[in-house]
Amino acid sequence: AGDLDGIVGIYDVHAYPGRRQVLSGDFRKSLVSMKSNVPSGSRIVLGEAGYKYQGDPADSLYWNEYIRRCEGHPYTKGSDCNMLVYDYFYALDMPFLAMEAMNGGFSGIAAWMLDDAMHTNGDSGRPEDLKIWGMWNILGEEVFGDASQEEIRPWYYTWSLICRYFPSGSSILKVVSDECCGFTAAAAVKDGKMSVALVNCNEEQLNVNLNLPRALENAVMFSFNRPGKVSESVAPSNGCLKMSVPAESLILLTEMEND
């Protein structure tokens, strides 16, 4: 990478790690290693990111479920898909991945992908080669005869929260925490306004002592819980918070305005 310094404007990696790899913290270590090879002053992003489950025995249940959903599927052969994008847990896994990228020193992440209808395997254009990766399928009824595919999937709600309240130009704050598989936290500041996000992918509630650089001012708290919708409430205003993060949930505290 050093030989390309001054030629490359930004470094870009496409990554599809496994679930265990991300939730255990191992993928963050890989990101830190990649970032260390980027010349000082240059930036690196995950220009394409999602999850794939084959190859890791710890992810075998997810891989087997992927295969089961592909078999006899009415409008895709399942080639280059993630058939689990419909599921609630994926709505936690994707912001978890984004927050690991932040904490790993990366400057951005782009989720693959917005809409199933955007892309077919090999660019064939054939419905049976559809890549199911999106937040919805805008052509669900029109092309595939299934209007339910046009419904917004749970991970849209959490991903949009991360995009809105960790916007471009934010400064990522260093987060120091005890290692806990299935839990991550990230914080950022832009224009003097702070955001903090917590994700708990575990099946048990976690109690967290949150020590912020300063007290939050006029902050809002967003919570994402089952069955898969976001609720909004007034956030606590002090800088040292004792919080309970429910099982399988996301909590986001922000001073940024909801534009």
Predicted regions and their residues:
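Alpha-helical scaffolding within the catalytic cores
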Residues: 1-3, 25-33, 95-96, 180-183
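Structural recognition of the beta-strand scaffold that forms the well-ordered cores
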Residues: 9-12, 43-48, 108-112, 195-198
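Carbohydrate-binding surface patches
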Residues: 178-215, 224, 248, 259
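Aromatic/acidic polysaccharide-binding cleft in carbohydrate-active enzymes
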Residues: 51-160, 164, 170-183
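Solvent-exposed beta-strand/loop surfaces of large extracellular or lumenal domains
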Residues: 222-238
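Solvent-exposed loop/turn segments at secondary-structure junctions
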Residues: 15-20, 49-54, 114-118, 202-203
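C-terminal beta-strand-rich structural cap/linker in extracellular carbohydrate-active enzymes
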Residues: 235-259
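Aromatic- and acid-rich polysaccharide-binding/catalytic face
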Residues: 1-25, 107
